[in-house]
């Protein structure tokens, strides 16, 4: 979009597991931007089909016939090691393998793609949606992540933004964004809980809001609990029921599984509004006796029973979040429901039980996070005044000390930005160096927490054990990404690192992916233009052949031959895989000759009218009401081939043309 000027807007993007959404501030209000397909959310799906890369709705449409090359729910893999995703691998039809550094990566047609690259494709789609609406090139964004994402996952999300060509001004938690959207116009002090059950993750955040200050008091959650898991229990139920009925196991049939996935998602959504739903999947498989059809009825009560253990998993994080905030349920003034799964009646009932009040359903759970991200973009861009956001880190940070113990420096739910320092010493006499192992988690032993970085402080002057003073400092920015330093107080020697995601990408890898994305963007654009031109040519052939068939008796034979020649020209260009310019040229030529059909018929109609007028005195007296029953249509037939558009031969002369 180089022809556009650079926009000053900072867009807000909710990069969701199932769907994504983009919003922007306009006239002091956050506006959700509709995609080119006319939807306010876009499926977070990327598919590879031949040389084509599909993103969003087109990718979702072809998933049933191309499951192994259709990548959905990839957010569950971002910033994670292959060794950490065994259970997630079981639920997806595509290939997940181990990358060069042990990261989880996807393999399609022998080529590896990182979750960051796939996330970047979705972000690029969001960027293009915003650019099409604003008419300007967008370069800056606020992107949301689950509140309980660790540092690796946050940093990897930021990398995805860079690959998409975005300067990510801030990474903010989804519940915090939702609270911004809810509270931006509220007066007075309130304590609110944001219950966010989305497609792949669950978060609960407790906030205090008032006078433009949004302070996160605590956050908790489960990054492995979401709508995908609710789909999965329905899929397993369908597989078991079908096996009982037909003796056939559908669990190894990827194409059938994709159909079951779509059916489960549809049933889940329907059961939020009705007490039972029919699941019909004809020709789901076949055996020696012929095709088999799946036809089942799922009631809301059955679904709630299947999903009971999943709903139960939301309770503990809520209780912990209240405890960390030093509040009880009765202290909460309002509970916001966020994420598509929060529409499930049993989930809403659980929220009511936990907090002792009806949850607030006044926000759109699919859009509120993107709206909040846009508001934060407005704050950073100076468009929104008098708003201060005080967020927290979701997990404790510390280092490994003697005995394999994790010593915590920054407790979870500490408000950020923040800086914490602590003095440590050596464990042996004349120890020349120390290795600082940086950890994230809540377990007492280092091995049970996530290692997110390590570095060495060397050249420590010889001294008895316990004498050297090593100052370790944690400096955490507003994005929740941090720097760690270690300094020998006596010598002043210091070593520091910016904690990059341990499952993240190196700078050279990011730069390569940025270049690849830009190159692919141009190639994708050319492929799309080629596809559009071929589709238009094919459609023009169909319309021309139909017009000849319908109007052959009413247009000159010379015109029929001219059109038939040009139909052949277009057909040959398609068959020979001619350059796009050539295909466009012959298609345009055919289109111009198609217009001559209407011109010819209008000419004939005018001649007939003139003839009728000349003979009006001696001609028969025709009732105009009878004439209307035998009207000519000079418009070309519609693409649907409806017989209503065909010309009828008039069995009367037209004597009056004024009613046209």
UniProtKB/Swiss-Prot annotation:
Annotated segments matching region Disordered: 591-660
Disulfide bonds: none
GO MF terms held by the record: ATP binding; ATP-dependent protein folding chaperone; unfolded protein binding
GO cellular component: a single term: symbiont-containing vacuole
Domain of life where this protein originates: Bacteria
Biased composition (Acidic residues): 646-660
Induction: By stress conditions e.g. heat shock.
InterPro entries xref list: ATPase_NBD, Chaperone_DnaK, Heat_shock_70_CS, HSP70_C_sf, HSP70_peptide-bd_sf, Hsp_70_fam
A Pfam short name: HSP70
Keyword terms of this UniProt record: ATP-binding, Chaperone, Nucleotide-binding, Phosphoprotein, Stress response
Residue stretches of biased makeup (Polar residues): 633-642
Phosphothreonine, modified sites: 201
Biased composition (Low complexity): 600-614
Note: Expressed early during infection.
Family: Belongs to the heat shock protein 70 family.
Function: Acts as a chaperone.
HAMAP family: DnaK
UniProt protein name: Chaperone protein DnaK
Species: Chlamydia pneumoniae
Organism placement in taxonomy: Bacteria, Pseudomonadati, Chlamydiota, Chlamydiia, Chlamydiales
Gene name per UniProt: dnaK
